[in-house]
């Protein structure tokens, strides 16, 4: 739902402005969260979760707002800092959610989400001004414009770089639980603690990107990030295949994938949205 909604959230933000769209999606998120809190059936809960996912598509506007405010190089730096902060939540949310669920029941995490959503809505309403002058083009026309973006060779380079970096990360997310529990034999709780390492690596990479992208350039930072990630994958593969598999052989080297992706993805995102700033 989030992926599909992102195809439309950008054109809508271009047509009506960033602020109105964010206010609308934040309100939808709060209403959807209330639906989850007071759900009396699994169907009602699923509808609420889908609506949460739809409203969460507005997360893409954070990068667009940064691009509205800063030039190409500075935008890469700022996106690095923003994604560093965003990496904190996936690191600790499973632990916090499990803790709240055990103490107060399954509705408790949704209450916390409602509190966060309320704070976000207040921040947008009281602090965020409009950063983009809305266009007269219709949403359908803006979507057609996006197809013209696909004819730009440069944007495909950024897309491919982002796709491959993300693919390596999601391959790790899908395979690490099986390898950790079934091959190495660690407990799920221990595995969860090791997962934090890659998240911390991603934060480190985001910090490096935010600190140095403007100085050395987007493309150079993406290359360095790819090299760091490849070193981590190669080292983990060597250790796991040539020695008795251990949990450290899996996660310690793969934390470099987090570092590399933290260096690569903010710059790929900034580069992609800079190819056609008019869109």
Predicted regions and their residues:
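Cytoplasmic helix-loop-helix junction between adjacent transmembrane helices
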Residues: 42, 48-85
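Helix-loop-helix hairpin linking two adjacent transmembrane segments in secondary transporters
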Residues: 44, 80-126
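C-terminal ends and interior cores of transmembrane alpha-helices
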Residues: 27-40, 228-244
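Residue-level signature of mid-helix packing/kink "hotspots" within the transmembrane helices
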Residues: 2-7, 57, 90-91, 199-203, ...
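Juxtamembrane intracellular "pre-TM" segments in multi-pass secondary transporters
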Residues: 129-159
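Conserved MFS/SLC helix-loop-helix module at the cytosolic interface between two early adjacent transmembrane helices
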Residues: 3-42
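Paired small-residue
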Residues: 28-35, 43-51, 248-256
């Amino acid at each position: 739902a989030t992926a599909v909604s992102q195809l439309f959230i950008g054109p809508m933000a271009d047509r009506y402005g960033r602020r109105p769209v964010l206010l609308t999606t934040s309100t939808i998120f709060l209403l959807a969260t209330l639906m989850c809190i007071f759900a009396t059936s699994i169907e009602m809960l699923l509808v609420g979760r889908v609506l949460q996912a739809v409203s969460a598509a507005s997360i893409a506007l954070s990068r667009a707002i940064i691009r509205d405010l800063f030039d190409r190089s500075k935008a890469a730096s700022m996106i690095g800092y923003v994604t560093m902060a965003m990496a904190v939540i996936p690191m600790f949310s499973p632990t916090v959610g499990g803790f709240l669920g055990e103490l107060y029941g399954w509705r408790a995490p949704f209450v916390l989400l409602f509190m966060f959503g309320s704070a976000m809505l207040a921040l947008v309403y009281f602090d965020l001004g409009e950063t983009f002058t809305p266009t007269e083009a219709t949403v359908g026309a803006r979507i057609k414009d996006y197809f013209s973006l696909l004819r730009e060779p440069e944007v495909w380079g950024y897309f491919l770089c982002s796709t491959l970096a993300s693919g390596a990360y999601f391959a790790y997310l899908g395979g690490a639980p099986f390898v950790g529990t079934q091959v190495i034999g660690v407990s799920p709780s221990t595995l969860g603690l090791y997962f934090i390492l890659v998240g911390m690596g991603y934060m480190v990479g985001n910090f490096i990107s935010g600190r140095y992208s403007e100085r050395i350039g987007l493309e150079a930072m993406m290359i360095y990030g790819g090299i760091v990630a490849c070193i981590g994958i190669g080292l983990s593969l060597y250790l796991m295949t040539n020695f008795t598999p251990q949990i450290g052989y899996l996660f310690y080297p793969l934390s470099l994938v987090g570092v590399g992706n933290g260096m690569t993805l903010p710059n790929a995102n900034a580069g992609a949205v800079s190819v056609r700033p008019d869109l």
